[in-house]
């Protein structure tokens, strides 16, 4: 099952196991399995904490090109030092880096601009989404509005946690 360009959206660490190294490794392992199953030619990630960065790391591990669609420059400016370090490690591996808006963080709306760019430039969306409101929900809603196929990963993630960890 090979599809072309996959965009990803998903929750921050608080909803997918936390900030520990162990939680990050679990999420990255799940991302690797998801990528092996769907076999995208390339992946678009928004580079947010949690799922987005786990997918970027999985792409590096599997040698799948990824495009970093960042909401703005200095997206990481309010993050913990360890999170900034990871972001700055991942970015140079991106095939290309795009910024949704010029300049530094102008407000949360730039994340939705980024989400729309990701959906518009992809063939389908893979969403690690539990149904709660927020940025992931907004991205999924936009993909639905645009008629994009959405691969919902929350149930497979729950199965993975129960059976593989």
Spans of model-derived segments:
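Acidic/glycine-enriched connector segments
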Residues: 1-165
């Amino acid at each position: 099952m090979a599809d072309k360009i996959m965009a990803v959206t998903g929750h921050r660490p608080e909803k997918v196991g936390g900030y520990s190294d162990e939680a990050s490794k679990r999420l990255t392992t799940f991302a690797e399995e998801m990528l092996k199953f769907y076999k995208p030619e390339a992946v678009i990630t928004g580079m947010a904490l949690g799922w987005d960065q786990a997918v970027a790391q999985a792409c590096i591990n599997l040698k799948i090109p990824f495009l970093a669609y960042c909401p703005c420059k200095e997206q990481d400016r309010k993050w913990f030092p360890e999170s900034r370090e990871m972001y700055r490690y991942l970015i140079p591996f991106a095939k290309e880096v795009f910024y949704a808006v010029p300049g530094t963080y102008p407000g949360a709306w730039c994340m939705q601009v980024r989400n729309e760019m990701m959906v518009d430039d992809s063939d389908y969306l893979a969403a690690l989404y539990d149904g709660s409101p927020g940025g992931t929900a907004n991205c999924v809603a936009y993909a639905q509005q645009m008629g994009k196929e959405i691969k919902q990963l929350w149930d497979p993630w729950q199965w993975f946690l129960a059976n593989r960890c």
